[in-house]
Amino acid sequence: MPDYTYLSDVAGYPRRIVCLTEETTETIYLLGEQDRIVGISGYTARPPEARLKPKVSAFTTAKFEKIMAVDPDLVLTFSDLQADIARELIVRGVPVIAFNQRSVPEILEMMVTLARVLGCEAKGREIVGRLTADIQRIACSANFFPYRPRVFFEEWKQPLISGIRWAEELIEAAGGEPVFPELRGGRLAKDRTVEPALVRERNPDVVIASWCGMKVNKESIRNRPGWDRITAVQKGHIYEIKSTYILQPGPAALTEGVRQLHAILARVCGVPVQPEIQPSEACDPDLHKSSPGRQMSTEELKI
């Protein structure tokens, strides 16, 4: 009979983790397990100290020799976009977990699942509970808006791509109404393309742009043919949220991302933002200009 006594010495949880996207890195830091991370994506920005970890990949490409050199016992990937990377790592004998979260509930589920994999599920559920409560607090604050601004969320400029599901869901939580709700289910960018003329027809009150890896050129948005007839352009309500805060399906979107969305929509409505839900990181500088419209009192904003 084979001797399996050696199995008692096998570590129960992964200790050398490579994260090929930003959201798993940030989640592991929130869990306080950052010492287990031995490799990250070059796009990682949060938290800043994570940038000191070895960089072993971009998004759709990876340095396999660098990954193998850090001797991982687990690699975390995201979606079909990293399927080729995952396949090669599996061929090389590396354990891989691929997440595929595309909505706010799925992001929360990803965080709990990752915590479970690391052996700290209770901490993960505690974090998810706090994030959920914060989003609910923002949604309650948005109930005091005089109206819900109609929002075109622009994920890319050419072709125009409307917001992915989690961004659209966070817009709703923050107090807005997406003008292309029927497209949010498109898992691929090509499934969410829109014609500029259709944006004119939907006539959003605000344009919120987040171009992945590129600074938004507001002047180019204002100068699109016929867009001078759009309410958002006429009233100067064109804003940027850095893709780091809203286009990664993880903690950043559920914290800073939704707070910046709420701050933008509050400005459009002409109301102040409660101190406890103010964005904590760099926002669009246009948000700091004097805001037109009626200012709601502190008493009106109490929830």
Task: Name each model feature, range by range.
Residues 1-303:
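N-terminal ligand-binding lobe of clamshell/alpha-beta domains
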